[in-house]
Amino acid sequence: QAIIVRISYPYRAHFELKKDFFRTFKSYLENKKPLSMITDSLMTPTFIDDIAFGLKYLFNNFSPEIFHLVGANFLSPYNACQLVAEKFNLDKSLIGKTTYKEYVKNKAKLPQFATIKSKKNNFYKMRTFEQGLEEIKKQL
């Protein structure tokens, strides 16, 4: 008997051991490095602070089920990078476009449509990516 919790594309303001996708995008843009972002793929970014609150609830209210603790919306990596640039006043012209097919060429394939939803999560309102970025701005 166990709880299985699935998360998707976690991101946060600080974690020095490993950069997540948000901090990687932000770092590239801050250092004026161009990025080629996928336009025809979807991801579900999840703010780690929300995951922590959701896990606390699940630990205190055990039920042997599968839960998805994921962000409130999904978007393309291109749109995610555009939002990072917008929220942190970085240069959007550094963000180029590519397709999923072109990006995974000669690489290990990634899921093209990672559109996971929190159907059973009626205990904690997960943030959208834009709301998560607003909170990160306050934390930085």
Protein language model regions, located:
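Short, glycine/charged-enriched secondary-structure capping and boundary segments
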Residues: 17-23, 52-53, 82-84, 111
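Catalytic phosphate/metal-binding cores of nucleic-acid and nucleotide-processing enzymes, i.e., regions
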Residues: 1, 17, 47-50, 60, ...
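Amphipathic alpha-helical segments that line or abut small-molecule/effector binding pockets
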Residues: 49-57, 134
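Conserved C-terminal active-site "lid" loop/helix of NAD(P)H-dependent oxidoreductases
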Residues: 76-82, 99-140
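NAD(P)-dependent short-chain dehydrogenase/reductase
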Residues: 1-43, 50
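Hydrophobic/aromatic beta-strand patches that form the interior of the parallel beta-sheet core
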Residues: 3-5, 67, 96, 127
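Mid/C-terminal beta-alpha module of Rossmann-like enzyme folds, strongest
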Residues: 54, 61-107
